[in-house]
């Protein structure tokens, strides 16, 4: 059956269909409201046990260990680095 597909040839030029792309709405407004909602949620809910443990490691100058812990729990290196930076900024503010 596979060989039968190889013998089929297209005898006319194939053109890409013309599709009009939809314009996206203003992103800045939605982004600002999303950041505001996240900030309010963080302020109300407080720190999770994972964040508390990471902060205790950061206070003890174990940045590497905190990053490894966060990477394991959050799923990626990029997310862990961002969370470590956020928690370090919180420590500096206090």
From Swiss-Prot:
Alphabetized Gene3D superfamilies for the sequence: 60S ribosomal protein L36
One annotated GO molecular function: structural constituent of ribosome
Primary residence: cytoplasm
Keyword Mitochondrion: no
Keyword Ribonucleoprotein among record annotations: yes
Pfam family, one: Ribosomal_L36e
A single BP term in Gene Ontology: translation
Keyword annotations of the record: Cytoplasm, Ribonucleoprotein, Ribosomal protein
GO cellular component: cytoplasm; ribonucleoprotein complex; ribosome
Record localization: Cytoplasm
Biased composition (Basic residues): 1-25
Domain of life: Eukaryota
Stretches the record annotates as Disordered: 1-30
InterPro entries: Ribosomal_eL36 (IPR000509), Ribosomal_eL36_sf (IPR038097)
Signal peptide limits: none
Recorded family membership: Belongs to the eukaryotic ribosomal protein eL36 family.
Assembly and oligomerization: Component of the large ribosomal subunit.
Name of the protein: Large ribosomal subunit protein eL36
Gene responsible for this protein: RPL36
């Amino acid at each position: 059956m596979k060989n039968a597909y190889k013998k089929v040839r297209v005898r006319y030029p194939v053109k890409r269909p013309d599709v009009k792309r939809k314009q996206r709405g203003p992103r800045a407004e939605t982004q600002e409201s999303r950041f505001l909602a996240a900030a309010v949620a963080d302020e109300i809910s407080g720190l999770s046990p994972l964040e508390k443990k990471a902060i205790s490691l950061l206070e003890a100058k174990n940045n590497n260990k905190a990053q490894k812990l966060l990477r394991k729990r959050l799923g990626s290196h990029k997310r862990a680095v961002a969370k470590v930076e956020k928690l370090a900024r919180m420590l500096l503010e206090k």
